[in-house]
Amino acid sequence: METVFISVVLMIASLFLVSNYMVQGIGGMTSSLRQFGMFLLNKAPAGLIDLFNDKSGSGTKTWLRFGMAWFLMACIGMFLGIWHRYDPTALNSLSSIGWSYDDGSMLTDYTAIFFSTALNYLLVGAALVAVSRASKGRLASEASASMVAVLLTASTIVVLLLPAIFSFIDVSNEASVLEIIQNISMFVVGAMLHIALLINVFITIGDREHNDISPTTWFLVLALVAKIMSMLFIFFGELVDSTQTVWMAERVLNGWVPLALIFAVAYHIIPFTAGRPVWSE
């Protein structure tokens, strides 16, 4: 249990430090770090970032559109699963194109990935809309937000296609190699992309039109920090075979993070629709 306590302490400390710096700032380094952050968002990676539009709202729209696309894939996977349970021979004709349907476990896993990815895109996209509305109507870098959304989808697709790719090649220790590559693509790359998004959100918060930080902003930032930390914990926990660390990080990634994002969206939609704050003053 020591590793669990250490991981929890590190995560809580990270959340505390981020919360403290959001309120107190970082003194004279604020301007320099903002310029450096904007340079990273607008210039890195060179060439690729130029392919994306920096028009106001384009980044949040990209997140929401990808969320709808992943949700459609989840619906298709769910439909195929229900159909196969109703008629186990319904998909046998697909063997003519070289694909045979087994017990449905892989389809179930893929559908779960589709749905969790869709949920992440839709909730983060909706929260980004709320944050941008409080900061001059745009994110610090809409192009960077769009690029992160595209690269995150590409990383997820790589994870989904790797088992099929490895079925055509002969690799020693195939299972372990496949797991390592999938973990790098899903957790390490995913964490780096979410760090870029977090930097974007931080700079956007710095451009807000009032001093107060909204509950939506708090929930979004803390959710992103918790997600980044849990992804890294899962990767390094798998690397050193620390099952307790992986267990704890998965609880955070699959439980705390979606809940925080749901609260982030709710704390914007409810007051915006009702015309009054969630909690009375």
Task: Describe these PLM feature segments.
Residues D54-K55, T62, N211, W218:
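Generic detector of short alpha-helix boundary/capping microenvironments
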Residues E2-P45, K61-T89, S96-D170, N183-I205, ...:
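Hydrophobic cores of alpha-helical transmembrane segments in multi-pass integral membrane proteins
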